[in-house]
């Protein structure tokens, strides 16, 4: 549903009050008729501005000169294989010259994510869905800026939780394969950050506790980052922080 549409100078499309809903597959055959019609909110966007080139669309190519979301709630539901991303975004702005609808490839030139709080739930932390996954999208991001953004990652079974805050960060040459759950970053410069790492089923102990880490005042530079199939690999070139134990 859309509340209001307007033309933004010079030839951009402004849209307000956008809501995207999706039926809940697991409730379609429920004996409760009220539950059968229940829907998940995939996106609730206060305002968005769109500037897309027209001619490439005829060849299934999308050239986005500007895509700007303001005050957005998101929930990917079952769109991403064995994962769910949900939360609030203050502002998401991007330029993407090279979206191939046929090959399911996306090239993002520049992107900014600010004032966001997002949760990423992996594997069996996501309720099972009977719909086969058909999301084979691959996304390349040349330059991604993060400001005042909070991420929480829940590992399978919620055994491990990692929270990261990006006060000011710049990532270059990022690559995402949404079907494989593969996430790579070529270079990361992270300032004004913090990280909390918790093994949820291990009791905390006093002093240095490697099962419950809390790193503050973080600055980090990494030449590569890799995450796939619960495996994390990073090449850190420079890092400084303060741990809650005093380290």
For each predicted feature, which ranges?
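Short, surface-exposed polybasic-and-hydrophobic patches located at secondary-structure transitions
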Residues: 86-89, 93, 127-135, 158-175, ...
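Short acidic, Gly/Pro-enriched loop/turn segments at secondary-structure junctions
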Residues: 56-58, 75-83, 100, 119-130, ...
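Conserved N-terminal beta-sheet scaffold of ABC transporter nucleotide-binding domains
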Residues: 17, 148, 166
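Terminal hydrophobic membrane-targeting helix
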Residues: 1-108, 115, 141, 171-183, ...
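Solvent-exposed beta-strand/coil patches in large extracellular/periplasmic or lumenal scaffold regions
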Residues: 130-159, 216-240, 244
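Residue-level detector of the transmembrane beta-barrel scaffold of outer-membrane proteins
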Residues: 66, 110, 233-235
